[in-house]
From Swiss-Prot:
Keyword flag Cell inner membrane: yes
NCBIfam families: PRK11646.1
Transmembrane portions of the chain: 11-31, 71-91, 94-114, 137-157, 163-183, 211-231, 242-262, 291-311, 338-358, 366-386
Compartments, record wording: Cell inner membrane
InterPro entries assigned to the protein according to its UniProt record, in alphabetical order: MFS, MFS_dom, MFS_trans_sf, MFS_Transporters, Multidrug-R_MdtH
Source organism per UniProt: Aeromonas salmonicida (strain A449)
UniProt keyword Cytoplasm present: no
Gene Ontology molecular function: any one: transmembrane transporter activity
The name this protein goes by in its record: Multidrug resistance protein MdtH
């Protein structure tokens, strides 16, 4: 691929990511507020619905990636985004737990189609030395989109949840049209790869599979920004607007620190050390919420948590792209989402159930201590994994 095509591809992917993240954050953080806080549903039910969405999207991501290896990126991306739009639109009319679960699963099916090929396009449009920086820039752009989306969603939630869902659906329809009309029919692999062959190549890479599974603990922490963090902040502040403050804080940290930290980290630290440092900060931030009694204290710990994500996520994504084999990029990037599937499902369901149990028992600190323990366990497993598998660290050379 010529450099001009790579450069145009990077610009398109950046703008496309902004539309996708706007559509996602308009809707997703509002689901727990709508059904738990406003409607009085059990957090466990809402967590189950969100977890099944995560499990569907990321658990089937390896299938979406394999299909993209065979048929190319564009048809999977366009079809997946339209399916996501349908799922978000149906959320507006969910009146029971079953309807909420079905809407979330439809949304997840859309994601399992468009997410792996988009991740594989990052590999196609970047050279290895510039990939980490480009991923960091994408994360900065996505953070800005997240805060705008969350602020829009929290504002529209004051009027009607239907407006929230229809705006999110509309943004995904726009993204689908842009991909249909602008994105060339790129192939992701060096040659069309049979689905079974791509899957087999990934499953034979034991070190990669082990790392992906360990990272499910990282994601169990990460998804709490969609579930119990918004509930806690809203309850302590007394207004849904405070949820927007959460994402404003995240954006401020991302825009000011993400790129400089990523550049500094590239020069001075290995990818695995950056990843583990980020998990340590996330664990500290989420575990100490158990002892926070004021909203400012919660926001200080949120800042620590977000800083951990800012350090860990570029390193994690860069590590995944470097470990992906050229003959099965879509399959590798799809399988890399399995950790998010398992961790997201566990985090959503476990977080929601712990929230309900803690409220019933008068022990509001319990979910945060349990999540802190998950973080410590994940960190220890990562240390052991990188020690046992030097090949995972060798990609830094």
């Amino acid at each position: 691929m010529v450099e001009r095509a790579r450069r145009l591809g990077r610009w398109f992917l950046a703008l496309d990511s902004l539309l996708v993240i706007l559509g996602f954050f308009v809707v997703m953080p509002m689901i727990s507020l709508r059904f738990v806080d406003q409607q009085g549903w059990a957090a466990g039910i809402v967590g189950l619905a969100l977890g099944l969405r995560q499990l569907t999207q990321q658990g089937l991501g390896v299938l979406g990636g394999s299909l993209a290896d065979k048929f190319g990126a564009r048809p999977l991306i366009v079809g997946g985004m339209l399916l996501r739009a349908a799922g978000f639109a149906s959320l507006a009319y969910a009146q029971s737990g079953l309807e909420l679960i079905l809407s979330c699963i439809i949304s997840g099916l859309g994601g399992c189609l468009f997410d792996p090929p988009r991740a594989a396009l990052v590999i196609k449009f970047t050279r290895p030395r510039q990939r980490g920086r480009y991923i960091s820039l994408l994360m900065m752009l996505e953070s800005a989109g997240a805060v705008v989306g969350a602020l829009l969603g929290s504002w529209l939630l004051n009027f009607d949840f239907e407006y929230v869902c229809l705006l999110g659906a509309g943004l995904f329809v726009c993204a689908a049209l842009c991909n249909l009309l602008i994105l060339p029919p790129y192939k992701l692999s060096q040659r069309p790869t049979p689905i079974r062959a791509g899957l087999g190549q990934v499953l034979a890479d034991k070190a990669f599979c082990r790392l992906v599974l360990i990272l499910s603990g990282y994601y169990a922490l990460w998804v709490q920004v969609m579930l119990i963090f918004p509930i806690l902040v809203k309850q302590m502040a007394g207004t849904t607007t405070a949820v927007g403050w959460m994402y404003t804080l995240e954006t401020a940290i991302s825009l000011t620190l993400l790129y400089p930290l990523a550049r500094y980290g590239e020069k001075h630290f290995k990818l695995e050390n950056r990843l583990m440092a980020g998990v340590l900060l996330m664990t500290t931030g989420i575990g100490l919420v158990a002892f926070a009694t004021t909203l400012p204290a919660v926001f200080v710990l949120l800042a620590c948590f977000y800083l951990g994500i800012v350090i860990a996520e570029p390193a994690r994504e860069t590590l995944m792209t470097k470990l992906a084999q050229p003959g099965a990029r879509g399959s590798y990037m799809g399988f890399s989402r399995l950790g998010l599937a398992l961790g997201g499902m566990t985090g959503y369901v476990g977080g929601g159930a712990l929230h309900d149990y803690a409220n019933a028992q008068g022990q509001p600190w319990l979910p945060w201590l349990v999540l802190g323990t998950v973080g410590v366990t994940t960190l220890l497993l990562l240390v052991n994994c990188f020690h046992r598998e030097p090949s995972l660290a060798r990609v830094n050379i």
